[in-house]
């Protein structure tokens, strides 16, 4: 499920972050950067040869002493092995083959994940010969690049996307809805999942997830089959070492990538945090269905207006996703727990909803009659027709006289009309505008 993940792995100072930043600098059609992580940009959405994928920078903190190098590289390589579809193994062509390179290569050889060996810092043609010693790693033919000068990146990416063709899913889980539970530690993610499993009593099996800190539980209900993904909680950087936090973030983001529906769990006694906003912002940006659950509602002193007030404050903090659904529960007492999977299924149904073209155009025609498009410059937007081209999320293409004439306020108006008529609560929708010459 989700886009392929490509992890950049290597010992310190081989140029992992330089390569990542070069790729994230829109030199290869980067779709978008992730929100939130300020100093260390961990994820970037990319596209090459019509393949969309997610790049991960697994670069860590520079070790303080030699004895830390091997353990740090082992941790990086292990994480990459667990969650990546393809691994870029980056080595330093100037410094040459190092013992730490051999340590990483040994781990990668044992895995069945495809690895592209990339020799960096080959800035001149005469340096090409420096790549030959890396054949000793037993990883295959190396690709030579200079990340600082953006040389050889196309050849490297060609090799990467070749592996996507061999990594197609067998489709056996296509009918199962993947739900990722995300949020801070101790917010009640595991308690809620255990409650759901205990009440449904239809667990197929428990298997290790794609990351060390997540467990996938399969649940079959009378309204759908679900995979429940329990993720590691995200802590404040002041409470843990930064390098450990980095891996926690990577694992959580990987779980979001796999999910159809992301459930952000918030502690009712603490409210929403900046970290919550960042992580759900990533789910929003890569177009996942979203449900916000406020847990521990039993611990809040309340009257008949408390829930509305709490929800209003949440919507202000999450104003970038006004479509999100909200649910107030207590995993401990079981209050409204029965509604969790039902509400997640509603989000998923809207996430995969298709609207017939005829009905769609009737609604848009009516919307235009009620509110004519504004004049932009000297031209007024003309909408000839609209059609839905995809789901996850629902995506609509408007064929118009000139896409430059669409004003953001009118685009928002059209989106609101679609939402009012077709109920897309719980999911974002995408509107695209293409030129069609008037006959």
Swiss-Prot record:
GO molecular function, one term: ATP hydrolysis activity
Domain KH-like: from-to ranges: 353-437
UniProt xrefs under Gene3D superfamilies: 3.30.300.20, P-loop containing nucleotide triphosphate hydrolases (3.40.50.300)
Keywords linked to the UniProt accession: GTP-binding, Nucleotide-binding, Repeat, Ribosome biogenesis
Gene Ontology BP term (one): ribosome biogenesis
Annotated binding of GTP 2, by residue: 183-190, 230-234, 295-298
Alphabetized InterPro entries for the sequence: AAA+_ATPase, G_ENGA, GTP-bd, GTPase_Der, KH_dom-like, KH_dom-like_a/b, P-loop_NTPase, Small_GTP-bd
Domain EngA-type G: 4-168, 177-352
Biological role stated in the UniProt entry: GTPase that plays an essential role in the late steps of ribosome biogenesis.
NCBIfam families linked to this entry: GTPase_EngA (TIGR03594), small_GTP (TIGR00231)
Family statement: Belongs to the TRAFAC class TrmE-Era-EngA-EngB-Septin-like GTPase superfamily. EngA (Der) GTPase family.
Protein name per Swiss-Prot or TrEMBL: GTPase Der
Organism annotation: Clostridium botulinum (strain 657 / Type Ba4)
């Amino acid at each position: 499920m989700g886009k392929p993940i490509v992890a950049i792995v290597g010992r310190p100072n081989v140029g992992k972050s330089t390569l990542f930043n070069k790729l994230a600098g829109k030199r290869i059609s980067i779709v978008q950067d992730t929100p939130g992580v300020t100093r260390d940009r961990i994820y970037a959405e990319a596209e090459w040869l019509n393949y969309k994928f997610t790049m991960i920078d697994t670069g860590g903190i520079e070790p303080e002493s030699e004895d830390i190098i091997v353990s740090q590289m082992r941790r990086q390589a292990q994480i990459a092995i667990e969650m990546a579809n393809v691994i870029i193994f980056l080595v330093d062509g100037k410094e040459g083959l190092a013992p730490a390179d051999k340590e990483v290569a040994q781990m990668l050889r044992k895995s069945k994940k495809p690895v592209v060996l990339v020799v960096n810092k080959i800035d001149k043609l005469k340096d090409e010969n420096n790549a030959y010693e890396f054949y000793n790693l037993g990883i295959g033919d190396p690709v030579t690049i200079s990340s600082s000068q953006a040389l050889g990146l196309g050849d490297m990416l060609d090799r990467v996307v070749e592996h996507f063709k061999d990594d197609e899913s067998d489709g056996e889980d296509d009918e199962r809805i993947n739900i990722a539970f995300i949020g801070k530690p101790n917010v009640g993610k595991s308690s809620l999942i255990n409650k759901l499993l205990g009440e449904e009593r239809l667990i197929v099996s428990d298997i290790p997830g794609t990351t060390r800190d997540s467990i996938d539980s399969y649940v079959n209900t009378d309204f759908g089959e679900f995979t429940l993904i329990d993720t590691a909680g995200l802590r404040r950087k002041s409470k843990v070492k930064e390098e450990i936090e980095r891996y926690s973030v990577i694992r959580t983001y990987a779980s979001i990538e796999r999910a159809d529906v992301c459930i952000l769990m918030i502690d009712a006694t603490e409210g929403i945090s900046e970290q919550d906003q960042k992580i759900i912002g990533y789910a929003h940006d890569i177009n996942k269905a979203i449900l916000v659950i406020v847990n521990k509602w039993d611990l809040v002193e309340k009257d008949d207006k408390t829930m509305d007030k709490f929800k209003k404050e949440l919507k202000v903090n999450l104003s970038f996703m006004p479509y999100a659904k909200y649910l107030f529960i207590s995993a401990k007492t079981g209050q409204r727990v029965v509604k969790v999977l039902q509400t997640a299924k509603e989000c998923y149904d809207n996430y995969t909803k298709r609207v017939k073209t005829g009905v769609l155009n009737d609604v848009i025609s009516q919307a235009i009659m009620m509110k004519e498009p504004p004049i932009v410059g000297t031209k007024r937007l003309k909408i000839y027709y609209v059609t839905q081209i995809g789901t996850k999320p629902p995506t609509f293409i408007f064929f118009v006289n000139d896409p430059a004439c669409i004003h953001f306020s009118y685009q928002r108006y059209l989106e609101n009309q679609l939402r009012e008529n077709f109920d897309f609560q719980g999911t974002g929708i995408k509107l695209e505008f293409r030129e069609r010459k008037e006959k």
